[in-house]
């Protein structure tokens, strides 16, 4: 691993590593410390007081960010008949069934999210080794296996994210772009925190949100005081 670049070291000086910021202040600081020439993504990392090795402490869910992620999400839908037409009308980028399966098996993967109607999962499930490792497999738990394809497409286009706690007990999720500004990012991160809080497992003991940090794609981490999250969560 190479040495940190000059711009990164300069951006680190704008962050007090010994301080845990309020949520809005942390977002403002992360924005101020961004330096890339492109519109960086603002990410949040939350260390939870859970042990995801135990099924009753798994935290997994979805959240529609009020202002979206700032990314143009390419949505693919596996469907037949009238559900194909419904998906196209809702704004899906790619819609089909066996033709799409054949295309994907041939190596094509130019989409970001996939939805499937339940009757298509017998076919789609056979592509688990292709779609699974890339996080593209439709899943009922995240609302992407459904007959209500219009709603699913609209939510993904509007900025619906899905997240899952990692083995170390950490959640990572994108909250939007630096260009959003701190206030819009605050709306997004508030919605995310509300969802995470609602998903707290009954088996989780002690402090739930143990540590939180936000960062831009290229910038340093900015710590948030977890005790202040309650001030923005409804």
Swiss-Prot record:
InterPro entries attached to this UniProt entry: Ribosom_uL1_bac-type (IPR005878), Ribosomal_uL1 (IPR002143), Ribosomal_uL1-like (IPR023674), Ribosomal_uL1/biogenesis (IPR028364), Ribosomal_uL1_3-a/b-sand (IPR016095), Ribosomal_uL1_CS (IPR023673)
GO biological-process terms attached to the record: regulation of translation; translation
Alphabetized CDD domains for the sequence: Ribosomal_L1 (cd00403)
Pfam families: Ribosomal_L1
Keywords: Repressor, Ribonucleoprotein, Ribosomal protein, RNA-binding, rRNA-binding, Translation regulation, tRNA-binding
Domain of life: Bacteria
A single cellular component GO annotation: large ribosomal subunit
Entries under Gene3D superfamilies matching the protein: 3.30.190.20, 3.40.50.790
Molecular function in Gene Ontology: rRNA binding; structural constituent of ribosome; tRNA binding
Subunit structure: Part of the 50S ribosomal subunit.
Role of this protein: Binds directly to 23S rRNA. The L1 stalk is quite mobile in the ribosome, and is involved in E site tRNA release.
Homology family: Belongs to the universal ribosomal protein uL1 family.
Name of the protein in question: Large ribosomal subunit protein uL1
Organism encoding this protein: Desulfatibacillum aliphaticivorans
């Amino acid at each position: 691993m190479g040495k940190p670049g000059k711009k990164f070291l300069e951006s680190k000086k704008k962050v007090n590593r010994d301080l845990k910021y309020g949520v809005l202040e942390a977002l403002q600081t992360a924005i101020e410390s961004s330096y890339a020439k492109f519109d960086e993504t603002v990410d949040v990392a939350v260390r939870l007081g859970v042990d995801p090795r135990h099924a009753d402490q798994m935290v997994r869910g979805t959240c529609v960010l009020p202002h979206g992620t700032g990314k143009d999400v390419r949505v693919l839908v596996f469907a037949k008949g009238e559900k194909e037409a419904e998906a196209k009308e809702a704004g899906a980028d790619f819609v089909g069934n066996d033709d799409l399966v054949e295309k994907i098996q041939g190596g094509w993967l130019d989409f970001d999210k996939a939805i499937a109607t339940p009757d298509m999962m017998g076919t789609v499930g056979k592509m688990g080794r292709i779609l699974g490792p890339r996080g593209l497999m439709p899943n009922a738990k995240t609302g992407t296996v459904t007959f209500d394809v219009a709603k699913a497409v609209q939510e993904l286009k509007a900025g619906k994210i899905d997240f899952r706690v990692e083995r170390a007990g950490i959640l990572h999720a994108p909250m939007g772009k630096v260009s959003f500004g701190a206030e819009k990012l605050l709306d997004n991160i508030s919605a995310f925190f509300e969802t995470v809080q609602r998903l707290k497992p009954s088996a989780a003991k002690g402090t739930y949100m143990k540590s939180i940090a936000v960062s831009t794609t290229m910038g340093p981490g900015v710590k948030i005081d977890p005790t202040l999250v309650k001030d923005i969560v409804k």
